[in-house]
């Protein structure tokens, strides 16, 4: 009897929760249950009447002597017909529960599939209604035009010292970024630009391609090809830089074990004020010259913002790089492990990718770098600077000390139109200002204007000796470079940016080979360049 009550109650609950789940055939079941319930109630009334009659009759009889009572017989088994019907009702209830579950899954999937498309600042994005799935187009286009004002002295130097004026597509990137099932993210970005190396278009190479797990926030796990953070200057995205290129000291560190397309496994901590990252890196995806084991390195960074309010932000960044195993140059067990450091003079229009300062060692045990940087913004002003230290330990050399180099930079900007630079928590770095009013002559809007400046120095000399003198034992004549840059950035809207910059480059270096041995092969010149950028 209780079982029938429970079955009836469960059936009623399911019918109330999901009325659409019951078909016309279920109405007959409900009618039969109602009839059975009425029969049970009638039987209960009759049993009650019999009990009352027996009680009255027992009151007039003498009390019987106590006798041993036999064990009660087991309850009679329900008739086969009733048992069959109960089993059928059980099956119907199970079917209704399963049907209700399927309908709930279908409802949830229908909600998920109701995707929403949007365009924000030129970026097309499609996302599911619950936000667990998304896909967004990403793109960066940078077209550079530059002129090197060198004169006859540069053309008289050894091959490679004369920079070629002209133009190139510094970056031409197109990618897809999004997430799946809420906690997983991905980013695939292909670059068809020259990267500043040849000045010509490329068939395309991986700039970033990684998978990321975000379900343990604020911790993030990332694996694939991407540039790990090697410092504050490095963490500015390519489209958010103050000037056309990063500082030379920062770029040296970036290229040691970071940079675009770097194979890496990285653990990040991303908080409002605190940022941390630790990455194990290998070669770049596009590097194909090494025949055997590739480079292995550790890259780490920690950044903290002790002051954050509506007017101020102060950030301090400490980072380090350890290339503990440089890559082999051939497939033999005794293969040398070469390592080099070089950087163009903070503008990449030259087709030959000429470097005025560089260091190259044929066989290296390890190479390392660390840097301390800091930046502060006050409303529409930014001031930033950093110091960098580098070292190389030669392999198989016990009589000479390791080689040491350094560099530093200071830079700043003033947004003339009053906007402030933004902040990227994901990168712990500043972003471009967004114009209050987009450029529109008909509406009197002119976008945002930013004045920027930088001074950087990079010293790749170590016990270099003097001009006219022989190179001391263990000395390195990598050269010293000093660059002063001023620029004007115009932001017509959040997608477009135009940068006009002028530079004074001063490089001093003592030659080591041939006719230039022990002679000064440095040079001083000016550059002027323009970048047109679209980024979304």
What is each residue range found by the language model?
Residues 119-326, 376, 404-409, 414-444, ...:
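Outer membrane beta-barrel
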Residues 22-140, 416, 420-438, 444, ...:
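N-terminal periplasmic/intermembrane-space "pro-region" immediately following the signal or transit peptide
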Residues 116, 256-257, 363-364:
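Short, solvent-exposed secondary-structure boundary motifs
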Residues 212, 314, 320, 330-536:
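Outer-membrane beta-barrel pore domains
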Residues 1-22:
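Gram-negative bacterial Sec-dependent N-terminal signal peptides
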Residues 17, 21, 148-149, 394:
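N-terminal low-complexity, intrinsically disordered patches enriched in charged
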Residues 110, 162-164, 362:
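Short, surface-exposed alpha-helical recognition segments that flank or form part
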């Amino acid at each position: 009897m209780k079982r029938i009550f429970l079955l009836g109650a469960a059936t009623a609950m399911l019918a109330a929760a999901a009325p659409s789940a019951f078909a016309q055939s279920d109405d007959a079941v409900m009618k039969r249950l109602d009839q059975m319930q009425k029969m049970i109630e009638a039987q209960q009334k009759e049993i009650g009447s019999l009990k009352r009659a027996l009680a009255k009759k027992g009151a007039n009889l003498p009390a019987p002597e106590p006798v041993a009572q036999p064990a009660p017989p087991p309850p009679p088994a329900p008739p086969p017909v009733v048992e069959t019907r109960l089993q059928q009702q059980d099956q119907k209830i199970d079917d209704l529960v399963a049907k209700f579950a399927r309908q709930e899954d279908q409802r949830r999937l229908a909600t998920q599939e109701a995707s929403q498309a949007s365009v924000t600042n030129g970026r097309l994005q499609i996302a599911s209604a619950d936000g667990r799935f998304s896909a967004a187009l990403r793109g960066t286009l940078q077209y550079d035009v530059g002129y090197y004002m060198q004169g006859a002295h540069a053309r008289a130097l050894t091959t490679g010292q004369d920079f070629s004026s002209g133009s190139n597509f510094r970056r031409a990137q197109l990618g897809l970024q999004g997430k799946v099932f809420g906690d997983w993210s991905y980013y695939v970005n292909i670059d068809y630009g020259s990267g500043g190396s040849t000045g010509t278009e490329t068939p395309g190479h991986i700039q970033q391609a990684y998978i990321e797990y975000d379900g343990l926030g604020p911790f993030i796990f990332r694996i694939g090809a991407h540039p790990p953070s090697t410092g504050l200057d490095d963490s500015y995205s390519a489209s958010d830089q103050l000037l056309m290129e990063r500082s030379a000291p920062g770029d040296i560190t970036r290229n040691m074990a970071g940079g675009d397309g770097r194979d890496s496994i990285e653990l990040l901590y991303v908080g409002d004020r605190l940022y941390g990252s630790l990455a194990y890196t290998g070669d770049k995806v596009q590097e194909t010259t090494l025949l055997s084991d590739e480079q292995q390195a550790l890259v780490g960074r920690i950044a903290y913002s002790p002051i954050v309010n509506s007017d101020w932000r102060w950030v301090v960044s400490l980072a380090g790089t350890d290339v503990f195993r440089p890559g082999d140059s051939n497939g033999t067990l005794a293969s040398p492990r070469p390592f080099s450091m070089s950087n163009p003079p903070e503008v990449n229009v030259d087709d030959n990718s000429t470097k005025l300062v560089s260091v190259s060692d044929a066989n290296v045990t390890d190479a390392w770098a660390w840097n301390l940087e800091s930046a502060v913004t006050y409303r529409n002003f930014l001031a930033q600077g950093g110091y960098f230290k580098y070292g190389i330990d030669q392999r198989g050399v016990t009589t000479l000390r390791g080689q040491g180099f350094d560099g530093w930079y200071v830079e700043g900007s003033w947004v003339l139109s009053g906007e402030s630079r933004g902040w990227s928590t994901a990168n712990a770095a500043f972003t471009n200002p967004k114009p209050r009013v987009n450029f529109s002559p008909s509406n009197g809007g002119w976008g945002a204007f930013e004045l920027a400046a930088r001074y950087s120095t990079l010293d790749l000399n170590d016990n270099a000796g003097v001009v006219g003198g022989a190179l001391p034992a263990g000395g390195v004549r990598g050269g010293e470079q000093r660059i002063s840059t001023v620029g004007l950035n115009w932001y017509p809207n959040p997608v477009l940016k135009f940068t006009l910059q002028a530079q004074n480059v001063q490089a001093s270096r003592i030659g080591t080979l041939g006719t230039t041995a022990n002679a000064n092969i440095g040079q001083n010149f000016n550059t002027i360049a323009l970048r047109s950028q679209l980024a979304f």
